[in-house]
A protein has these predicted regions:
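Amphipathic alpha-helical scaffolding segments
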Residues: 172, 208-212, 501-505, 517-521, ...
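Catalytic cores of RNA-modifying enzymes
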Residues: 2-466
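S-adenosyl-L-methionine
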Residues: 1-81, 474-478, 489-497, 509, ...
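A positional/structural detector of protein chain ends, strongest at the extreme C-terminus
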Residues: 612-614
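Internal anion-binding site segments
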Residues: 281, 296, 300-319, 394-397, ...
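Short amphipathic alpha-helical patches
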Residues: 223-230, 507, 523-524, 597-601
Length: 614
């Protein structure tokens, strides 16, 4: 394939941006590459128009507009009443933004440090006089305001010591959305952001182990969160998610797009997921071929294996090529063998989950006796033994992937093997993101993605929080903050049982599940020794025994990791903690979970914000 032209040679706007940053200032543009391709803007807005063309009149708050191409395209599509451009580096972008601001009376051009704004209410009052309490739609539990749209072209940090990343700004946006403060003072608003791709993948994680703080806060209030456009990535995350899950999920996304008649413009398609090659010689211990993501290492194996096919035995280097082929086949076979046993362990773990579901339903059957559980319990025991045996066939690095892939299956396909009810927004995406080519951003070489967020007026999390008196929500919020912080790097294996022991000392798991029935669906279950003496009733909001508390069962959450819990269940834990009357400060809670707090979380960013817990 011929190399694509550079941004400077293809797009006049790239040259104009370069002129805005002469000499030593050019390095500063690396913080925030600008969209220079009109076609990318047009394709992205074609995708977004059903979400953006909602109602008029509409106001737009446009943060870090930079070169202004994206801003001008959105203005033309939405025809806003007011479009306020806030560019912190206006001294550099003025040659591009001044003509834009003068091109239509809806524009107003300002310069201020966006990150330092602690209270947005005065900004709304001064520059958006039509915004007020009457703009809010209060028909849902979370009031929404479709008359204000925020565009944010978030910069990257300039230093590893800078804690205030684009993701942190996004997280604050979600927190204030929950609290109905700041930009959400008159109702929850929509956000269309461009930001560094790693930050986008933190907001919309591809696999459950990457589900951390910013994604949890987003899930609390999101109706829609999806990538509109993104650069090509190497898809290493597929190794953690599971190749089969990723393939099946992509197929379901294609079905969703077809159902909505959504097509992808030519050249905007992502490369499909390719499986690793099969070995031409399966070796002395053959196992069935197991699909996994193809990598550059597999390509090298193929080259070494195929190189010998074109060589005569008398050719110099034949002996060395033969050794390379043998090594490549051995490594390819070993890679397949590890993948095979890993998949076997995952499949058996999924079967154990299914057996626990069957056990729950049997325990609710009036005709079941304790003797009826023996086949189920025997099968669970046999499956566990098999997992232990197959675990011995795997290297340590592969074994570490086992709980990750099992959890990915649990969160993607737990509900009736249906991706539409999956935990992660990535699994529920309405379409694949459009492909951003490197030269469509200037400067090149820094990946950025475009993400759309829309709040959910019927958020189940907000409904749960509303069950508490406003004066009694502080401890619940503090625990949620601490739990979300604890899911940082190194704490992927944090179990629900560990958390419950820390915040509910002295309480049994059964007692806690009785108070929080939503935990039941995740737990391992066994019939109580005196099962026959207990009633078969189920407790909780569900009629399905799997998701309800049953007095005749014992529950175990020691093998359940926190990152697979829905935010709704996490908030059930937080609300039970609030009601328990045990009040601990954020710092004390954080110490319980072995974490550390940055100045960001100790409240520096909130000094000017009066927090309203909805």
């Amino acid at each position: 394939m011929a190399p694509r032209a550079s941004a400077l040679s293809r797009f006049p706007l790239a040259k104009s941006i370069a002129k805005c940053f002469p000499g030593h200032l050019k390095r500063r543009t690396n913080r925030k590459p600008e969209i220079v391709s009109e076609e990318l803007c047009d394709h992205a807005l074609q995708r977004l128009s059903p979400y953006l063309l909602r109602n008029r009149p509409l106001d737009i708050l446009d943060l870090w507009p930079g070169a202004g191409l994206w801003s001008s395209k959105i203005n033309r599509l939405l025809q806003p009443r007011r479009h306020v451009l806030v560019e912190p580096e206006l001294q550099n972008f003025r040659p591009l933004l001044d003509p834009l601001a003068q091109s239509h009376p809806s524009y107003k051009l300002l310069s201020m440090d966006v990150f330092s704004i602690g209270d947005w209410k005065p900004v709304l009052t001064e520059h958006f006089p039509e915004q007020g309490p009457d703009n809010g739609d209060h028909t849902g539990v979370l009031p929404k305001n479709d008359t204000l749209l925020v565009l944010a072209n978030l910069p990257a940090t300039t230093s590893d010591k800078d804690h205030f990343t684009a993701g942190r700004w996004w997280q604050m946006f979600m927190e204030t959305c929950m609290q109905q403060t700041g930009l959400h003072s008159y109702g929850a608003i929509r956000l269309l952001a461009s930001l560094p791709s790693p930050e986008s993948q933190a907001i919309i994680p591809r696999y459950v182990v990457d589900r951390r703080r910013v994604s949890l806060w987003t899930e609390n209030v999101a109706l829609h969160t999806f990538e509109v456009a993104a650069p090509q990535d190497e898809k290493f995350w597929v190794n953690h998610k599971g190749f089969n899950v990723a393939i099946d999920n992509a197929a379901r996304v294609a079905e969703r797009a077809a159902e909505k008649n959504i097509s992808t413009p030519p050249g905007r398609e992502f490369q499909p997921l390719l499986p690793a090659p099969e070995s031409p010689d399966p070796g002395r211990k053959p196992v069935p071929y197991t699909p996994r993501i193809r990598t550059a290492l597999h390509d090298r194996f193929c080259e070494d294996i195929q190189a010998l096919d074109n060589m005569d035995k008398s050719t110099p280097g034949y002996a060395e090529a033969k050794k390379k082929r043998s090594r490549a086949q051995t490594r390819l076979n070993r890679d397949n063998r590890q993948a095979y046993f890993l998949q076997q362990m995952v499949d058996q773990s999924r079967e154990i989950d299914a057996q626990y579901d069957a056990l729950s339903r049997a325990a609710a059957d009036p005709n079941t006796t304790s003797a009826d559980f023996k086949p189920i319990l025997d099968k669970i025991s046999a499956l566990r033994s098999s997992i232990t045996d197959e675990g011995q066939e795997n290297y340590h690095d592969h074994l570490k992937q086992f709980p990750h892939i099992h959890d990915s299956y649990r969160t993607s396909l737990r509900s009736n093997n249906n991706f539409d009810d999956a935990l992660l927004a990535w699994d529920r995406r309405p379409f694949e993101p459009l492909l951003i080519h490197p030269e469509e951003l200037y400067p090149q070489g820094i990946d950025r993605s475009i993400v759309y967020f829309e709040p959910n007026p019927n958020s189940p999390v907000i409904e749960k929080i509303n069950s508490l008196d406003p004066s009694q929500r502080g401890d619940a919020f503090r625990l949620f903050e601490t739990l979300s912080l604890s899911l940082g790097r190194g704490r992927e294996s944090l179990s629900v049982a560990e958390v419950l022991q820390l915040i509910f000392p002295g309480r049994s798991t059964n007692d806690i599940v009785k108070s929080i029935p939503s935990l039941a669906e995740y737990a391992a279950k066994t019939p109580k020794p005196d099962f026959d003496s207990f009633p078969k009733t189920i407790h909780g909001g569900s009629t399905d025994p799997v998701t309800s508390f049953q007095e005749n069962l014992d529950y175990d959450l020691s093998d359940v990791r926190v990152h697979i819990l829905s935010t709704s269940t996490i908030w059930d834990i937080c609300i039970e903690y609030q009601r328990s009357g045990v009040s601990v400060s954020s710092v004390q809670l954080n110490r319980l979970f072995g974490g550390t707090l940055t100045s960001y979380k100790t409240g520096v960013h909130r000094e000017m914000v009066k927090k309203r817990l909805h």
